[in-house]
Amino acid sequence: MFRGTLSFDQEGLRRVEELADSYGFKVTSVNAGNNFVQASRDLFEGQVKGVKMCIDAAFNLGTPVVRVFGGEPMEGKTEEECVRAIVEGLRMVASYAEERGVTLALENHGKITNNVDILLRILDEVDSEALKVNMDTGNFYWYGYSLSEVEEIFERLAPVTAHTHMKNGTAERKYERRKIGEVKLTPLPEGDINLLKVVRMLKEKGYKGVISIEDEFEGWTTLPQEKVVEILKRDVEYLRSAF
């Protein structure tokens, strides 16, 4: 479970609020880095405990959303076994989220939940009003869906989307189904996906959540800080131009 540099106790959460206020930020979600596909029951239950800790943190911060993952493939487990583990884990934490009045936003992430049919199956089988989707616009493209398929997926997921990660990239064969990872991640205005169209579509379909930037453009970890800030400011201006 990724906790950054602050603890999830009351003092740590108080510090989060202070830091957010000092920068004029609003905490829109707590991010759980869980993986329900585990080699043992003890490890699985540890993941459940970690997500519940994030739900408590969101509740105490007055934040409506916890971003969750499903899980990743594991050697020795079939895809079906992995999906069943994800469904079981999400059922356990969704019931707790319902009690706390927190929404879980399952991200399309990695090699399982980026399959949109599996993602929707998980939502259907968990069958909880507390479980929705965190729409990561770049991850479906990374997974190998063509540009037209990605646009159709966004339309399908809009009614069950509770949070977003705006991400973009370019692909040499953008109109074809590709292998996983055949994408170069770019600043938001420079990718193949028309994110302004996505943002407008979400609003038209009644989405009331935040438009969150998760720009993982190549070089973001090595460029000078001022250059990264410049690119992120351009991302913000780009998304604001949707309205």
Residue ranges and their predicted role:
Residues 20, 58, 104, 136, ...:
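Conserved, mostly hydrophobic/aromatic
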Residues 2-8, 32-49, 71-83, 176-186, ...:
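Surface-exposed, active-site-proximal loop segments in enzymatic domains
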Residues 30, 88-192, 196-200, 243:
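Acidic/histidine-rich catalytic cores of soluble enzymes
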Residues 26, 64, 162, 208-209:
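Short acidic/polar active-site loop segments enriched in Thr and Asp
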Residues 212-216:
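Short acidic/histidine-rich active-site segments
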Residues 223-243:
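C-terminal helical cap(s) of enzyme catalytic domains, especially alpha/beta-barrels
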